[in-house]
Amino acid sequence: MGLPITPYFRPVRLKFLSYSYVLHNLILTRTMVAAHEWAKHHQSFSLIDKRISYELPGKIIPDAWLMFEEKTDDGIYEQPIMFEIDRGMELKPKFRAHVAGRLQYLRSGEYKKAFKTDVATIAYATTGQTPEYREKRRKDMCLWIMELLKERKLENWAGNFRVASIEFGKLYDNSLFEEAVWYRPDSPKPLSLFAPE
């Protein structure tokens, strides 16, 4: 009769409700909502598919995957984005391992099996409490990505990466999708998310 209950507290069930975890997921959700709203108001772009991490199978799971279509005079182009939200919790070795995992995922064919395309931009958006911290973290991430690409002789992959520092409160202002706030790891020049390699 009724629903079964567990009569004792299980702290292990709360480990995923830390402040950092909740904030990460809130930023991720806001980013996906912002992408949806931005595409809705831009006739040349459509958001045709979106998936969040808990919907994705496999060993390598991006925080989010967004498939945009861009309509130009030359035709329609796919613009898939693997979004990764960086809260600055990973030091250099762990971050490099994260990037290496994404590279292997794309190069192995597993990405193509999961998303039916072999095209991808890997977009790392870092957050933090102060503008100085966010900018330093963005520069560090660009440096670490480029070091890894050089070590593996994959410098030509630099165009597949974008890194931005974002402010939580400004996620809905569309700057993430239309302004030059992104950086390739091999260039100090800001560009838009959808700028050609």
Segments from the language model and where they lie:
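Electrostatic, structured charged patches in enzyme active sites and in nucleic-acid/phosphate-binding
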Residues: 2-197
